[in-house]
Amino acid sequence: MEAALGRAKDKQYEPATTYRGLGFGLKWVPLQSDTGWSAGGRLDWGRTRVRDDATPGRWTEREFALTALATYRLASGQALHLNAGRKVVKAQGTSQSAATWAAGYEWPLAQQLQATAEVYGEQRLRPDKALGLRYEMVEGLKVSVAAGRGNGRTFGQVGMAWEF
């Protein structure tokens, strides 16, 4: 079982819109293997506050997602991650749902440090791409940072995950 907390900020200059997000996720991987395939699922909740500096517009989006997870891990510690799921976003009195997907790869750089690369997206949108680092502070407690681009914007992410 893993619990994760994430924070994101995305500021666009044209139009001048700021997004501030906070999220929480629970991951359960009942089929685990040190090498080869592992499989599980993830449930996520997120909130994004949107502020448009050009107008007095401000609102909050809420998002719920359910994702199937598959990982293929090599003996070298490298891992390929494949995800597919569905999300629902509620904002300004409306609700929309979309299929989601992701593919990622991680490389061990040191005993507790990994480089990460991922491409992810959702139905009807172009993919986002990100590069990052994940560091295991103590056994089971990981912090991560990533920066990326996609859909005409640049973004950064900071996260923390606790495996228990």
Model-derived regions: residue spans:
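Transmembrane beta-barrel domains of Gram-negative outer membranes and organellar outer membranes
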Residues: 1-164
